[in-house]
Structure formats: structure tokens, C-alpha cells
């Protein structure tokens, strides 16, 4: 299904609290943008969810399964798929080989079959077809035999989305997906995210600084500031929030108290996993 929930998720580094008891529930069929000023704790929150960092306190659940004590790779197998700000690819392999490896990682039982030449050939042919199907979806078949190192930055990010698709996650996590892209490259990635969003069985989380991208893609926005969840709601409502303006601009409008009601009911939900 892709129901992701964090409960009182916290990260402390010495005396610094990078993420402070953040509780959120993310539902399938929605794209949630996680925004906030630099140092707000957005990427740290992502790291806690995906298992790149251990939580000091709190829990992470996906479809009722607790992920808190699992490694990053185990969380990937459970259904969390994360793209990084820096591409995480094999530069000396071809585009097709990269995707085929990702497809192979999701295949269950292939490695348990007898090691005869026929089964090896069948597995290879099947994986290749699946990888080619994914490359067709992201319009990269013409680059299938190119090495990753030869691709421009925008195409490498595009390939990273293809790798995520190969893993068949129920939750997609994008951390600054258009970072470092030109004005011509960024729309390609955004179109891929739109395609993923059209699948109402998937849950999408997006960390993004570009507010025009957030306004266009997000069904919901949560705002972190100094590691705390300060606003959670629909884009228009959150954008107009005095709490959000204070977090970004450092100015405390008179209306800030009235805006505190923007914190989502999700954060205060009494529903247990």
C-alpha cells in the first residue's frame, strides 16, 4: 500500500537536536513536499526514514511493519526507494547494465535456481527485457549502451529515477531531484515524477528548495524549522502561513499565533500503527 508513518522521530548529535520528535503519516496517492530553510533538518529527516542514520528516538513504520531497527538496504527491500542529491550510479557500466542490476536486486529466488547455463541465460534475458521496458518508460533506450560516465548530469538523474522504478518501491523519496540541473534538464525529471504521481498506489516524498516546483507538484507541504514540524497542510494554506513566513524570513508577523493551527491533524492523530 505505501502507508508511511514516523512517530516522534528524533536525531541528536551531541547537544544539537537536528530533528525533534517529528510525527507524520504519508498516504498512497499523495506527493508531500518537505520544505524549510537551510539547516532545518529536511535531509536528516530523510536519512532517519531511509535508514542512512539511526534515530535517537522514535519509530518508522511502513504498512504496519516497523522499520526502525532495520538497515538502509533492508528498508529498501521493504519498499522504501530513495534518490540522492548526488547520483548513486555505477559510472563505468552502461545505462542498461545499471538498470539490469537494479531489476536483479528485486528478483526473488533467481539465485536459488540451479547454476546451469540454460537457467543463467533465461535469467539474463528476462532481466534485460525488464530493464529495457523501464528504459522505454523514461525515454532512455537510445542511450542503453552508453556508459553512465558519458551522460550529462541531467540524464544521470533521469537514470536514477529509472533505478528506483526497477526496485518497485511503494514509497519514492526524492531529495532535491533537480539539484544542479539546467533549465532544459529539470523539466524532464519533473515529468517523470508526475508520471509516478499518477499511480495512486504510490507514496511520494519530495525535499525541494524550489518553491515553484513545490507549488506545481505537491498535494501537501510540511515545513521543518530548527528540526521541528511547524506547519503541515495544503500548499496554498501553508504558503500563506505566518509561521512559514517567519521560518523562511526570520520575521514574526502578528498573525503567527493564529497560524499555529496549520499543524496537520496527521501530526496529532491518535491512530496507532
Residue ranges and their predicted role:
Residues 1-273:
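Glycine-rich phosphate-binding loops of nucleotide-dependent enzymes
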